[in-house]
């Protein structure tokens, strides 16, 4: 009797397939078997690319004579620690009574690669191969995936992109790490007084290092600029509110060189002068020049993809992206949430049609039981497909991370943090079935003489989705916030994580901006509603508020993941930015691991309490070496464009050979440029400039510095190179 063979990526996933298939047969060594089915598993990767010395022993010794290393055919080998399981899977693949193979590895590029390597190494089994593609591990979804499984050949382009990604990382890592180590490793080790220093380089890893080092140097080079704002205290029916002066057209200071932006002065004396000029008119009064009232909606945020979830968990729980991925992977394997390694923040049309089941299951989840019941009773889910939360065009492999509504008993077996991560996912999900929060926005312009003062108020009228957004473990904080809302009538950020993608640009200078929306109690709100143009109000006082510009913020582990996801926005070339606008560096499956590796090899340091990321001295030195030799590796343009190329291969837009030709040309050209270069004479000055910032750190060891100032160390430095390396 012919049997079907199901190959999962992990033993735990294989168990779920066995349950769904009702396999009650014997458990054997490395697989489960019934009368008509066999279920086995990999343990992640069973096969890997061989080291260069497996091609020829001469490659074991690092030498410029053997670079660039560009094999015509790539060699692979079984990973020694999993040899036994590989032999089991190989034997099952070639069993005579197996006629159909169901590939059940993770539904994505890496899962595809895991199986293809095993099949390649196992030899010609000549069976029918079907690909199971699922979004969760619920029994219903597993059976749907098996019923709708396509021929494996439908995923050949995805497989090609997976092989190319591995070859790309392999060739860049081996060639660039070896050539840079051979040329400049001694410069680094001699400076640090260490015995030997390999220079580790990677397509994505080095780009991330560049982002962190550049940000740190921007912070060091930043010089705070003081500025002085002029504020009016305006009386209205026994209440007071502020107006902020701005040098708009008609002001005596309009476009003068004394200004810092339009709402402040560079020097305090000019702010004092303005006040004296305005105080000439007594009694001090202002006229309502303009008043605007409008309602403003704040929509529920988009659903979680992995990057957004990692960012939020970094803020809420102070855990690293790697920890978040482990937690959400565990929740996925326990059937609690959908597939975690996704870049999408929306649902598919097909998923939206079945979303009732997810909501219905959440009626059994204590924290959202009433919410889920309300959504079902009101039928809020019925028009979901027409909202911005459903968009098939924004989905590649998988839709957003949402709760399945199943497996709730498994919550007892996970950590407290995992339980809270789950609730965070659930809250984000149920929010999309609620209306927007509604605010009353009041904008007011008053004039004293010809000088304009601006006031802005934002009042919460209807909580909308905010009423269900607050996590239960944050109740006290939320209650305090809501109490404040009820007293002041002003909306806070009650329980809602706003989308805050750090694109890596110099943001965060709140002090530079105009005054934020002001608090407004019930009496003041009523008075403002009655105001009209031409009304004259009393001004109690004029004052000066001093501020200063803020440096860029350091990345934390969450904002770093978002910066990697949004790295396309960092590209200055408008045409290139448009081409790869949605393509970041790395993938949702690899970003956390890359960040972890940079910390493990001591190029970056992660503060576990704050999750703030900073470079180490070694990391800055490696940055300087790469910046002077293969600068392209530090730039998002290169990394994101390679990633876009892999997507083109997966889509069938370009061929595997076209991509490979470009890759080999790049590796060959850059390797030879480094071989021909000589930047040692310039590296010392860069190392010195970085080291001065670590003079109190054990990192520096006994390395000598030039004693340059911190600001000098932070200044942009140009690496001059001999013509041979151009």
Spans of model-derived segments:
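Short active-site loop/helix that positions an aromatic residue
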Residues: 14-22, 116-117, 209-219, 427
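Conserved short loop/turn motifs at secondary-structure junctions
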Residues: 2-3, 104-107, 196-198, 293-302, ...
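Intrinsically disordered, low-complexity regulatory segments
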Residues: 1-178, 265, 474, 495, ...
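C-terminal accessory/connector segments of nucleic-acid motor ATPases
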Residues: 222-245, 284-321, 327, 336
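Basic, low-complexity terminal or inter-domain segments flanking catalytic cores
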Residues: 2-5, 28, 82, 93, ...
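C-terminal or mid-to-C-terminal helical accessory/interaction module adjacent to the motor/catalytic core
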Residues: 74, 87, 96, 137-234, ...
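Metal- or metallocofactor-binding catalytic centers and their adjacent structured scaffolds
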Residues: 255-302, 310
């Amino acid at each position: 009797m012919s049997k079907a063979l199901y190959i999962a990526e992990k033993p735990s996933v294989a168990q779920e397939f066995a349950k769904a298939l009702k396999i009650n047969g014997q458990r054997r060594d490395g697989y489960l078997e019934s009368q008509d089915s066999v279920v086995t598993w990999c343990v992640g990767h069973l096969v890997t690319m061989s080291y260069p010395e497996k091609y020829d022993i001469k490659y074991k010794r690092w030498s410029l004579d053997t670079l660039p290393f560009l094999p015509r055919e790539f060699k692979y080998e079984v990973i020694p620690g999993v040899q036994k399981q590989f032999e089991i899977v190989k034997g099952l693949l070639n069993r005579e009574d197996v006629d159909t193979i169901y590939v059940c590895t993770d539904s994505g590029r890496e899962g595809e690669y895991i199986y293809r390597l095993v099949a390649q190494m196992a030899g010609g089994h000549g069976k029918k191969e079907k690909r199971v593609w699922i979004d969760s591990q619920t029994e219903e979804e597993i059976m749907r995936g098996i019923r709708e499984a396509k021929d494996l050949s439908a995923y050949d382009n995805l497989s090609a992109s997976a092989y190319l990604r591995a070859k790309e990382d392999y060739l860049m890592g081996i060639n660039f790490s070896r050539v840079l180590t051979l040329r400049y490793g001694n410069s680094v080790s001699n400076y640090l007084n260490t015995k030997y220093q390999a220079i580790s380089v990677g397509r994505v890893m080095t780009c991330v290092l560049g982002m962190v080092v550049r940000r740190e140097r921007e912070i060091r080079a930043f010089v705070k600029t003081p500025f002085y704002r002029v504020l009016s205290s305006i009386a209205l029916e026994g209440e007071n509110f502020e107006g902020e002066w701005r040098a708009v057209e008609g002001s005596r200071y309009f476009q003068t060189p004394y200004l810092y932006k339009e709402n402040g002065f560079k020097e305090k004396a000019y702010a004092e002068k303005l006040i004296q000029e305005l105080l000439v008119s007594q009694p001090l009064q202002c006229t309502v020049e303009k008043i605007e009232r409008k309602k403003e909606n704040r929509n529920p945020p988009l659903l979680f993809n992995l990057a957004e979830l990692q960012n939020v968990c970094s803020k809420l729980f102070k855990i690293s992206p790697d920890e978040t991925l482990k937690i959400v992977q565990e929740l996925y394997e326990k059937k609690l949430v959908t597939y975690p390694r996704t870049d999408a923040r929306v649902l598919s049309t097909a998923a939206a049609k079945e979303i009732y089941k997810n909501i219905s299951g959440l009626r059994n989840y204590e924290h959202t039981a009433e919410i889920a019941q309300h959504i079902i009773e009101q039928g809020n889910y019925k028009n979901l497909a027409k909202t911005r939360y459903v968009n098939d065009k924004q989905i590649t492999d998988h839709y957003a991370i949402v709760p399945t509504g199943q497996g709730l008993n498994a919550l007892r077996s996970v950590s407290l943090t995992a339980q809270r991560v789950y609730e965070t996912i659930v809250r984000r999900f149920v929010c999309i079935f609620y209306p927007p929060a509604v605010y009353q926005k009041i904008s007011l312009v008053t004039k004293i003489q010809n000088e304009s003062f601006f006031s802005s108020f934002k009042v919460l009228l209807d909580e909308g989705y905010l009423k269900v957004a607050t996590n239960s473990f944050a109740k006290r904080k939320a209650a305090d916030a809501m109490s404040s809302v009820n007293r002041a009538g002003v909306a806070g950020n009650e329980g809602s994580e706003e989308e805050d993608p750090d694109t890596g640009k110099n943001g965060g200078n709140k002090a530079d901006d105009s005054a934020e929306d002001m608090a407004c109690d019930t009496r003041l709100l009523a008075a403002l509603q009655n105001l009209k143009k031409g009304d004259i109000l009393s001004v109690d006082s004029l004052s000066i508020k001093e501020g200063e510009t803020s440096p860029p913020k350091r990345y934390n582990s969450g904002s770093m993941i978002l910066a990697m996801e949004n790295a396309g926005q960092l590209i200055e070339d408008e045409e290139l930015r448009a081409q790869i606008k949605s393509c970041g560096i790395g993938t949702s499956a690899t970003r956390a691991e890359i960040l972890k590796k940079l910390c493990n090899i001591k190029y970056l340091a992660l503060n576990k309490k704050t999750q703030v990321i900073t470079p180490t001295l070694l990391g800055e030195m490696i940055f300087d070496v790469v910046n002077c030799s293969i600068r392209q590796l530090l730039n998002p343009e290169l990394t994101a464009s390679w990633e876009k190329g892999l997507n083109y291969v997966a889509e069938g837009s370009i061929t595997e050979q076209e991509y490979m030709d470009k890759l080999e040309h790049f590796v060959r050209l850059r390797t030879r440029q480094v071989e021909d270069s000589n930047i040692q004479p310039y590296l010392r000055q860069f190392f010195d400039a970085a080291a001065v910032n670590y003079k109190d750190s054990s990192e520096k060891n006994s390395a000598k510095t030039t004693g340059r100032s911190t600001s000098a160390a932070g200044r942009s430095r140009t690496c001059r190179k001999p013509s041979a390396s151009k």
